[in-house]
């Protein structure tokens, strides 16, 4: 049985880890939860899950400007685990904060506080859902086609895309005209769109040569509690498993 390390320890009040475990076990994979890079020994892949705090903006050369509960010590653990996985060329899936960690690790930056955060932010009373456009030629398009309605729980997102990455999914604010959306999708497909924005949020990224990809949304939370109208979350985990 192949093993996958899920980076993290401690309580799991929002079922971030348990959702990943459920998905992995459903695919016949063993989940190991740890923040120690050494525990990647014997593992076939790594999942960087979501959660708080925000990544320290000093890691991408910016002052604090909207990031919350920054904890450099925790960042160091996450980046250390990711570095070991990259060194071993292991498949990596980053979810929400994990997607942001991947982007920053490879040289990208983040929008520290989205102007459209109310559309994306966590709501304890209900599951917030919005549509995304999947970029042709990426894993997201292969899994879901042109559009993927997803859940959302974040106030930050990728700004400057890491150099070795492509965009897999985008969210557009309703204020962006349809023809402009089409142009931005074409730019993302061509690799010429390299920055996210408050009204054009990068929701998925993928490395051009390594088995590494990230999602700004939360497929793991949809595994145990599906939300009507959203995508099948297991497609993401099956894709990850196919890379192991």
Regions found by a protein language model. Give the residues of each.
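N-terminal beta1-alpha1 cap of cysteine-dependent amidohydrolase-like domains
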Residues: 1-95, 103-111, 115-147, 155, ...
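Cytosolic ligand/metal-binding cores
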Residues: 100
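Active-site-proximal beta-strand elements of phosphoester/diester hydrolases
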Residues: 213-216
């Amino acid at each position: 049985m192949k093993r996958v390390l899920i980076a993290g320890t401690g309580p799991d009040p929002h079922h971030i880890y348990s959702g990943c475990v459920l998905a992995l076990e459903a695919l016949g994979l063993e989940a190991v939860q740890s923040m120690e890079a050494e525990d990647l020994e014997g593992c076939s892949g790594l999942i960087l899950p979501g959660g708080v705090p925000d990544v320290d903006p000093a890691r991408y050369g910016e002052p604090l400007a909207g990031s919350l509960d920054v904890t450099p010590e925790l960042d160091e653990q996450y980046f250390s685990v990711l570095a070991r996985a990259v060194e071993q060329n292991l498949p990596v899936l980053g979810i929400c904060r994990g997607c942001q960690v991947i982007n920053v690790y490879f040289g990208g930056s983040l929008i520290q506080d989205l102007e459209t955060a109310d559309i994306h932010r966590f709501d304890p009373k209900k599951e917030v859902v919005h549509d995304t456009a999947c970029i042709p030629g990426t894993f997201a398009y292969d899994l879901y086609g042109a559009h993927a309605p997803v859940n959302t729980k974040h106030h930050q997102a990728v700004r400057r895309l890491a150099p070795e990455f492509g965009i897999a999914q985008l969210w557009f604010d309703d204020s962006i005209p349809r023809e402009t959306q089409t142009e931005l999708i074409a730019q993302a497909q061509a690799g010429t769109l390299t920055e996210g924005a408050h009204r054009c949020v990068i929701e998925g990224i993928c490395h051009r040569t390594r088995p590494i990809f990230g999602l700004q949304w939360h497929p793991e939370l949809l595994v145990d509690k599906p939300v009507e109208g959203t995508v099948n979350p297991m497609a993401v985990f099956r894709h990850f498993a196919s890379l192991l």
